[in-house]
């Protein structure tokens, strides 16, 4: 929307023969968010428009989900890019240390739609009642912080903490995992998510090796 408002033309495919800048956000064709792969871009450069500039945005890694193939794949996909953009310095350092060959590396932090995710109608804790704690995740991987969330859920079994705090989890949870003392809400997005987040006073995240999740930004 920003680019369109600035007068630029935007396309989500490689059908045009005069694309100035190609942005790769997800080179894996198995991903639902992938419009084209790095191989598609490579063919475009070779047969259609060699002058197009390729920017590769990296926001994923093996470390966050204990996988062993993502980093190598992204490093290979990155070889056709003119510019690499990372969502955090932590992720940039990780890929540089693992041998990514890009010489142009920048960090651009992610952001949320401030028309939706803001402090409007948010009421801070006035200490008169329980402190309402919340977190949310779309992914259900254990590394999202479920070691922390399960401990918090366990704390709520005691009268001491049950009188002081509440915990709300919005999103998906791992298979064969369940909360006993936590309010569980199905995944939400947009205004519905923002409304529910504002019903609480403290946001926490226990996500491990997170390049830059959207959850804490929202």
Spans of features found by a protein language model:
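Extended catalytic core of nucleotide-activated donor transferases of GT-like folds
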Residues: 11-80, 90
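A short, active-site helix/loop in glycosyltransferases that binds the activated sugar's phosphate group
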Residues: 79-105, 112-116
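Nucleotide-activated donor-binding/catalytic signature segment of Leloir-type glycosyltransferases, i.e.
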Residues: 171-202
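Aromatic "clamp/platform" in nucleotide-sugar-dependent glycosyltransferases that forms part
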Residues: 208
């Amino acid at each position: 929307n920003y680019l369109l408002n600035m007068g630029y033309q935007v396309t989500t495919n490689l059908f045009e023969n005069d694309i100035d800048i190609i942005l790769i956000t997800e080179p894996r064709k198995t991903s639902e968010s992938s419009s084209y792969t790095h191989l598609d871009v490579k063919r475009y450069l070779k047969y259609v428009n060699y002058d197009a500039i390729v920017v590769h945005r990296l926001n994923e890694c093996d470390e966050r989900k204990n996988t062993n193939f993502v980093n190598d794949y992204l490093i290979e996909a990155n070889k056709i890019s003119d510019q690499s953009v990372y969502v955090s310095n932590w992720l940039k350092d990780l890929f540089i240390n693992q041998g990514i060959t890009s010489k142009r590396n920048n960090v651009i932090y992610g952001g949320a739609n401030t028309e939706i995710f803001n402090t409007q109608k948010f009421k801070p804790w006035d200490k008169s009642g329980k402190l309402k704690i919340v977190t949310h995740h779309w992914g259900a991987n254990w590394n999202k912080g479920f070691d922390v969330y399960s401990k918090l859920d366990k704390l709520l079994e005691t009268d001491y903490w049950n009188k002081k705090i509440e915990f709300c989890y919005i999103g998906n949870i791992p298979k064969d995992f369940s909360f006993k003392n936590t309010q569980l809400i199905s995944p939400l997005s947009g205004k519905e998510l923002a409304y529910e987040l504002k019903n609480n006073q403290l946001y926490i995240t226990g996500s491990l090796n997170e390049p830059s999740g959207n959850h804490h930004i929202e």
